[in-house]
């Protein structure tokens, strides 16, 4: 959309109608989004406004021209470790800025990471995951469970370490072109996060430095 006041393009996310009728969800959605609106960092998609009009609840955010990291991985198959590290560092900087303000993302995955046409990496959807995870099941759950921390898999206490774990899974996918755990159901994948040892990424990514494998 075009912001006529400031003369810039913005992205708008609108809450689905089935969620808009849940007052508790809407209240949590607004609270979380308003908290995230206080985040300003080069590696975060900034939130400009939160509001509602005629029953539609929306978030106005920075418009990033580019593609998601998920699409980028699918196009390239596997990323070199140097490129993966560069992307991971930028994601980590964004996550750190949020954690410094006591904001946890809870849904770090390649679909929530944008790569702009200039090569800048930005994490999006801060403030949305917590509201969505509490009492709803979205179509994105199957995609998210591949990156969920063990504590998320068991519905336990979540803190900043969950985001770090998820970033580790994202790094694994960048260099191998696959996620470490997969299955036909969300439960099957979640159980693997809790119980299974992941195959070392060097099995799929030749010449991977030992230092990165340890991460």
Where is each model-derived feature located?
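Flexible N-lobe loop architecture of eukaryotic-like protein kinase catalytic domains
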Residues: 31, 40-43, 56, 141, ...
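Activation-segment/catalytic-loop signature of the eukaryotic protein kinase fold
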Residues: 50
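Conserved short submotifs of the Hanks-type protein kinase catalytic core
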Residues: 54-68, 72
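Activation segment signature within eukaryotic-like protein kinase domains
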Residues: 87-88
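Protein kinase catalytic-loop region centered on the HRD/HxD motif
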Residues: 91-103
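C-terminal lobe helix-coil module of Hanks-type protein kinase domains
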Residues: 146-215
């Amino acid at each position: 959309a075009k912001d006529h006041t400031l003369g810039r393009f913005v992205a708008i996310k609108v809450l689905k109608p089935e969620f808009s009728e849940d007052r508790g969800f809407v209240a949590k959605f607004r609270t979380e989004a308003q908290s995230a609106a206080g985040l300003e960092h080069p590696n975060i998609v900034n939130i400009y406004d939160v509001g509602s009009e005629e029953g539609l609840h929306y978030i106005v955010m920075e418009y990033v021209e580019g593609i998601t990291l998920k699409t980028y991985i699918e196009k390239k198959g596997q990323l070199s470790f140097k490129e993966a590290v560069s992307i991971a560092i930028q994601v980590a900087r964004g996550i750190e800025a949020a954690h410094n303000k006591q904001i946890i993302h809870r849904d770090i995955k390649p679909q929530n990471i944008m790569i702009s046409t200039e090569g800048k990496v930005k994490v999006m959807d801060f403030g949305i995951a917590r509201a969505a995870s509490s009492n709803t099941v979205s179509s994105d759950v199957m995609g998210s469970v591949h990156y969920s921390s063990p504590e998320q898999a068991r519905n336990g206490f979540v803190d900043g370490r969950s985001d770090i774990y998820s970033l580790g899974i994202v790094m694994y996918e960048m260099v191998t072109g696959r996620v470490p755990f997969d299955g036909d159901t969300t439960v099957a994948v979640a159980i693997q996060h809790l119980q299974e040892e992941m195959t070392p990424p060097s099995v799929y990514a030749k010449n991977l430095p030992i230092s990165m494998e340890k991460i």
